[in-house]
Amino acid sequence: TFKDIEKKIFEYACEMAREMTRELLEKYDRDLMVVRDKNAYRSKGKRHTTVKTIYGEVEYDRNVYEVKRDDGTHEFVYLLDEQLKTERVGLISQYLAEQLVAGITEQSYRDCAEEISRTTGQSISPMGVWNVIQSLGEAVCDDENKLVEEHKAGYIKGKEKAPVLFEEADGVYVNLQREKQDKGGIKVGIAYDGWKETGTDRYSLDGKVVVAGFSNSKEFHEYREAAIAEKYDMDETMIRIMNADGAEWIKNVSDPDTIFQLDPFHRNKAIKEAIPHPEAIRDIHEYLDRQDIDGLFDFLDAYKNSISDDEEMERVSRLITYFANNRDGLLPYTERGIKLPANDKGLVYRDMGTMENYIWSIIAKRMKHNHTSWSI
């Protein structure tokens, strides 16, 4: 059948690719041996190794050299790896590792392993995929910690200038496996310098910086600040605005001058969940539209005193407390008379509140589908 022909040709192509890769690597390694600085690199023979690629395992030999460093220590190196800037995760090639990462964001470890094994020339087990992801995750954590330390030391300074920096943060819970708790909270943050017009009444965020992690609030904010500083020159930023749901871990940001606004989506959701009567909901929004915050609280107190149902009274009490804890942020920044400096790139300033879309695209779509559970 055509399927059989297709499969045999694919297998043959993978076999040829493995042989071509072996020949190319070994020839390049021989060339490096000839042109090397023989005084600096003392040959210590060849070593056999294997690299797992998208077209299967490639076995080849490469020369190892002894090098004496300036501090007098001796080190063994592979010139071939140095010249090719070889990056691996164990025996997995960088490109194959990237395919595994792309697959695991949408699939389980088992499905990802089956997909890679079926569509490439490389067979891999679910545990093999897990090991690769763990190794990459540890490397990412090391890079993040290094960035935070460099930021604390004052070495991080981005090149982009943003007179106004818009920031949003939120959290989402995902199922955990083999952990003491059933669910774990992932913190997500995004920063951008404005909106770019992409069409008639169509806009996109400009200069996005997105961070996410299971870390505690202190560690999350430290990394968030470092990631922002890596892109933006914070000395040029005059105003920072944070849009969030009012959670304490979000409001305790590093910059005390950050302007906070309660995310309109969460604000309106809280109103709808606490108030069952459409007329009362309309009245609440009218107070907000008139920017009459004192009148809003008077109305909520009067509404609470007018009801007799204990459960509804409790819900209204929680709403009043929620609004009281976020009183300064009940109105969006656009309704507070805040004068924002113009952006040199011609960006526009609009209403904030994109976090829910990013929660879905960054976390929920990848980590909450198919009842998936995760370990941390």
What are the functions of these language-model segments?
Residues 14-91:
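Basic, low-complexity segments
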